[in-house]
């Protein structure tokens, strides 16, 4: 949609813009695993007409440093998975710093919970310098952007961002997504 609007306005695409748009599409679709349709592939095929190294983009998006790999292990070992299929983890500044990473260098952990078969939706809470939490919210089954809207965020139906100002906000967000999944699965609180 964004690509078509740019074309309709007469803006000229160049190789750098094509690479950046391709990077965004690859990231937003989880490397073409979700939130896509034939239009996505049509746009990508047009982007390939520009001179950029699309293989390098994929390589850079799928490789990580040793510290990033260690944080990945931590996330997988410490992820809380609720009976509803909702998973979440809180990454504090101290934890992120212990792996010699910064908040911006943790985007790679967002897809990790998707590798666990019982996980239907997940959230990564990343503490910010101001003491609030950036929320990366993803789902395979339920629409989560309306929940994200209630926490100063938004995004796609299955991939959104939000903000939790306090740990109470974290609890509320977890309860909301968990409750929505429980309703979808016809579960009751007793089955938790």
Stretches with model-predicted labels:
Residues 22, 27-192:
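Hydrophobic helix-and-loop "lid/oligomerization" segment in the mid-to-C-terminal part
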Residues 1-24:
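A short, charged helix-loop
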């Amino acid at each position: 949609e964004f690509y078509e609007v740019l074309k309709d306005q007469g803006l000229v695409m160049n190789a750098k813009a094509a690479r950046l748009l391709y990077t965004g599409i690859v990231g937003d679709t989880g490397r073409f695993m979700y939130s896509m349709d034939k239009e996505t592939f049509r746009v990508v095929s047009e982007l390939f007409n520009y001179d950029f190294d699309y293989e390098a983009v994929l390589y850079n998006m799928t490789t990580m440093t040793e510290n990033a790999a260690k944080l990945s292990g931590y996330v997988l070992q410490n992820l809380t998975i609720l009976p509803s299929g909702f998973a979440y983890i809180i990454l504090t500044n101290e934890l992120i710093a212990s792996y010699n990473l910064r908040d911006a260098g943790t985007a790679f952990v967002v897809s990790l919970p998707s590798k666990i078969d019982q996980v239907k939706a997940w959230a990564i809470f990343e503490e910010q310098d101001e003491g609030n939490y950036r929320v990366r919210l993803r789902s395979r089954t339920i629409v989560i952007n309306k929940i994200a809207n209630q926490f100063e965020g938004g995004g796609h139906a299955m991939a959104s961002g939000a903000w939790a100002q306090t740990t109470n906000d974290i609890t509320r967000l977890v309860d909301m997504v968990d409750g929505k999944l429980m309703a979808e699965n016809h579960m009751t609180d007793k089955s938790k």
